[in-house]
Amino acid sequence: MGAIIHHMLDRAPAPVAPFSHAVETDGWVFVTGQIPENPDNEDEPLPVGIEAQTRRVIDNLKLVLSEIGLGLEHVVSARAFLIDMREFETMNKIYASYFPPNKRPARTCIGVTGLAKAARVEIDFIARRP
């Protein structure tokens, strides 16, 4: 097994718990779940509505990936956590807009009873470095 690299990034939202923004080993990159915080102002209230929250979450994930030299095209798997499964279709519409139809990562969506900072959605990624 190769070295394990823990990425703590200044430009990404500050962790709300004890974790790294991403952990990398043997070309695999595990990106910690992001909630819809503003990376430039964590005191700002979360966006209202599942559409705005989903956009912010994926933009935060893109930021983490870009800081370590990767992009959405490197994502092989995602997990989405939703407070309200009635928002599944709306979240999917926003999520799908970030990936070409024939290049979408594998994904699981899980209904949960709560997320940090009362977020409505959290998403994490697994990416592969070329």
Where in this protein do the model-derived segments appear?
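N-terminal presequence-like segments and the immediate start of the first folded domain
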Residues: 1-59, 63-76, 82-130
